[in-house]
């Protein structure tokens, strides 16, 4: 992958491929290929596809702990094999869970760069509001190194994701934090894939 700067892999998806191989061997293979191509990695943990082995260790109502445990486990393996060019992301469609997961991870491994995002945030303006809540709370505490805004918009309108991200970051930098506004939590929560 010499022309690719960074590749994301999802720890939860590793269990569905080559089931006879332990996940550690799969990660070592990914890291080897990345090192050969001078490519960084992102350990992309997503609420919808958490490592099944980790999920079994926690109560069903606790979705954050298995995400954080999976990210810590994969980070430790990459450290152990000497692969240091990696970041971590912990994404959920609920901004409160994104905040909790990233705070928990950052408190344990503050030296690892974090990529922030709210997955399947939905349509604007709600998708922007959800993302803003997470980014404002985390970035204002020094948590987060890169960001992605995921909105359900047609491909020709994907520029809205970049515009929203820039506006949120500019507002945070200028001290214009808006997340004191209560985001509705008692009505329907529309969750949708950014490309669907």
Place the predicted regions along the sequence by residue:
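Active-site cofactor/substrate anionic-group-binding motifs, chiefly glycine-
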Residues: 1
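Glycine-rich tight-turn/loop motif centered on a GG-T
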Residues: 4-26, 53-65
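Non-cysteine beta-strand/loop elements that form the S-adenosyl-L-methionine
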Residues: 5-12, 40-47, 114-116
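Short amphipathic alpha-helices and their capping/turn segments at secondary-structure boundaries
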Residues: 23-40
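Catalytic alpha/beta core domains of metabolic enzymes, predominantly
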Residues: 31, 46, 55-196
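Feature marks short, surface-exposed loop/turn motifs that line or immediately flank catalytic pockets
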Residues: 49-51
């Amino acid at each position: 992958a010499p022309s690719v700067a960074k590749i994301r892999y999802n720890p939860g998806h590793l269990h569905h491929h080559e089931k006879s191989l332990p996940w550690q061997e799969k990660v070592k293979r990914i890291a080897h290929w990345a090192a050969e191509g001078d490519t960084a990695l992102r350990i992309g943990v997503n609420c919808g596809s958490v490592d099944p082995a980790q999920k079994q260790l926690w109560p069903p109502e606790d979705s954050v702990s298995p995400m954080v445990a999976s990210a810590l486990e994969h980070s430790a393996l990459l450290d152990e094999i000497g692969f240091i060019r990696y970041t971590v992301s912990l994404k959920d469609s609920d901004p409160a869970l994104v905040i909790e997961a990233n705070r928990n991870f950052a408190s344990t491994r503050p030296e690892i760069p974090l990529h922030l995002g709210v997955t399947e945030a939905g349509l604007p303006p709600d998708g922007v509001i959800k993302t803003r809540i997470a980014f404002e709370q985390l970035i204002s505490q020094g948590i987060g190194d890169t960001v992605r805004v995921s909105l359900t918009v047609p491909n020709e309108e994907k520029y809205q994701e970049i515009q929203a991200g820039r506006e949120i970051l500019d507002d945070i930098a200028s001290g214009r934090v808006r997340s004191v506004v209560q985001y509705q939590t008692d009505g329907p929560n529309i969750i949708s894939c950014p490309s669907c």
